[in-house]
């Protein structure tokens, strides 16, 4: 039997966790640290950080945010999405502390990068 896994999605806008309503309206939730700590404490299998400002504004990944999250003493694997435009970004995201990367725009912009990752 396949084990069910629970992945928690955390939407980040301007370095704050937000609740998204159809990606048009955003309600502030607060700082990312207590959110990540609570998700780890509740036993989720993976925490996915969606940094929605990064791709939209062509800013590249938020390495400071990834390092800050990875410095929190949690045991839950972390995945990151946002601003990953090439394979070097993906490698740097993993080097900054994320265990996985989530690709979206890169698939449409330059699918050859996927093989390099």
Spans of model-derived segments:
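Short histidine
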Residues: 108-117
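Conserved N-terminal beta1-alpha1 strand-loop-helix module at the mouth
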Residues: 1-76, 84-88, 96, 109
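Short beta->alpha connector loops at strand-helix junctions that form conserved
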Residues: 82, 104-106
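Short acidic/polar active-site loop segments enriched in Thr and Asp
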Residues: 45, 99, 104
